[in-house]
């Protein structure tokens, strides 16, 4: 029973301390870069950027937009 309790506490702590960026902010940053959050892979003509807020999603930015 103690093991189950410790596992539950550990699981909650890991989820709450998942990073320094609040949920949803990564999606906003992607949209500000004129990108789209896509699951796993980007379409042709797009390059991969940072991760989005949702698990497994990547920010895909058009390759025609030049780096600033």
Swiss-Prot record:
GO process terms (BP) = antibacterial humoral response; antifungal humoral response; negative regulation of interleukin-1 alpha production; negative regulation of interleukin-1 beta production
Disulphide bonds annotated for this chain are 30-59, 37-52, 42-60
Report the principal subcellular site.
Answer: secreted
**Which Pfam families is this protein grouped with?**
Defensin_beta
Subcellular location(s): the record lists: Secreted
Q: In which tissues is it expressed?
A: Only expressed in epididymis (middle part of the caput).
Keyword hit for Cell membrane: no
Q: Which family does it belong to?
A: Belongs to the beta-defensin family.
* Protein's recorded name: Sperm-associated antigen 11A
Q: List the taxonomic lineage.
A: Eukaryota, Metazoa, Chordata, Craniata, Vertebrata
Q: Which gene encodes it?
A: Spag11a
């Amino acid at each position: 029973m103690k093991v189950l309790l410790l596992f539950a506490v550990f699981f909650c702590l890991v989820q709450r301390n998942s990073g320094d960026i609040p949920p949803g902010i990564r999606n906003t940053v992607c949209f500000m870069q004129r990108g789209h959050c896509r699951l796993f892979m980007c379409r042709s003509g797009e390059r991969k950027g940072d991760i989005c807020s949702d698990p497994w999603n990547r920010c895909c930015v058009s390759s025609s937009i030049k780096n600033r």
